[in-house]
Amino acid sequence: MSFKMSRKQYADLYGPTTGDSIRLADTQLFAHIERNATVYGDEAVFGGGKSIRDGMGQNSQLTREQGVVDVVITNAIIIDYTGIYKADIGIKDGKISAIGKSGNPSVMDNIDIIIGTSTEVISGERKIVTAGGIDTHVHFISPQQIDTALASGITTLIGGGTGPAEGTKATTITPGSWNLRKMLEAAEAFPINLGFLGKGNSSSLPALEEQIFAGAIGLKIHEDWGATSSAINHSLQIADKYDIQVAIHTDTLNECGFVEETIKAIDNRVIHTYHTEGAGGGHAPDIIKIAALNNILPSSTNPTLPYTVNTLDEHLDMLMVCHHLKANIPEDVMFADSRIRKETIAAEDILQDLGVFSMISSDSQAMGRVGEVIIRNWQTADKMKKQIGSLEGDKEYNDNNRIQRYIAKYTINPAITHGISEYVGSIEVGKYADLVIWDPQFFGVKPDMVLKNGMVVMALMGDENASIPTPQPYYEKKMFGAYGKAVQSSSITFVSKVAYENNIKDKLGLNKVVLPVKNTREISKQDMKLNNATPEIEVDPQTYEVKVDGKVITCEAVDVLPMAQRYFLF
């Protein structure tokens, strides 16, 4: 005999289900649950009087070797580029082993995830689970960035640097084999996935090649070192030879040629264009039009996202500091001014929303904020819904198309671009369990818990001397996965395939999981999930007006945002 209950009763017990919608933080974005992989009446729930008990939802006969998982997240709402749905998530050996229904196969039908004596439970009822974020534009200026990134839901950092040196403060580059070795050694201490870019500014193939053998997962070309056509061509030759990615910050001053010369030098080869909007750097005023090309994998950084009344004012001073410019030198001021164009900044929000720009990253401490990739991603999505309206296919209390487009920008698309999508970037079976758990009202702002390879590394935690975990002060703190040898087993250092094959792990005495990047050269804009539009883009050289397929695009700066002061005292 079946038992009926109201949707509210069900949501209180097990979390929302198929047909329900969840508001994301204080935005106007609503995630609509498309399906439920759990079974009504057989929900796996932990706690006093609940179902995960010996002989009920927990099988105490089967062992770990017989399929029992290490960790299960129960009744979670999954938000991923693959869909928005409800399911249990099984984790074994640090990887996602199954997504579906958990429980005891001895007393329940159609069990995908076996809960046993060896299983730890994380309650996902009324929680949202996303893949860990990937930030591909990181200046490794200070190691403290890593805690800030983790606390925001970022689990992979890709970029370059050696600390607060002038080269690092301006460019995301770890130059040469010695510096790469030192940063790979330093990476051992951090409970986060890391990959380092070598310097691509060279017309010497051997000088570029030695960095790939030293473990660089790619090359970065930056205008401050000279973004010449020769450097572009040589870096891409190395990329094609060793299956690595090239990232580029193009020539703002157009000293080495205009955007057309850069496009010619790239010569239809795939490349990741940083600062495609131009405010952070790149051919003035029309670098933005490069996003129309199918071989370009475009990203933009978070200081210009979303466009607000403060965006223009803060950029000049940031630019002067980050690029070693002097306010008393007129040429330096003119250089800075040439980058900051409200017309292209206003167009950036639109291009992100249309799926023309495929990724969002930080530009950490070098005009961007490492802890705000996720916040600004969703602020932009909310701003666009309010200013433009729902995307095609979305409707009242259902913004799934927009939500899936935007989550892809900081998860799967950066992973595909830099050759790590086999390991991370989405909630799919076989990938490492880099997962972020959110309370819906704090979604995108403050994670409830961050898992690395299935182990909790960061979580909200209260006073350690309290009788329960939640008394104030209640804030993000490192957990056991961030200490001791667990750091090495719960996180990954990415290296080039040739360095991996030459056993760089043993040569440098690395203890972390070391994995090679792969499949970066035979991809295109069409591989960017839900963000693969290639319209014609024009920029007026006098007015900086941006047109997409002949239509002017712009948006208003806003003075109020969600996910902001409501959540932060400072």
Swiss-Prot record:
It is found in: Cytoplasm. Ni(2+) 1 binds at residues 137, 139, 220, 363. Its main location: cytoplasm. The active site is at 323 (proton donor). One of its GO terms (molecular function) is nickel cation binding. GO terms for cellular component: cytoplasm. Its cofactor is Ni cation. Substrate binds at residue 222. Belongs to the metallo-dependent hydrolases superfamily. Urease alpha subunit family. This is Urease subunit alpha. The lineage of its organism: Bacteria, Bacillati, Bacillota, Bacilli, Bacillales.
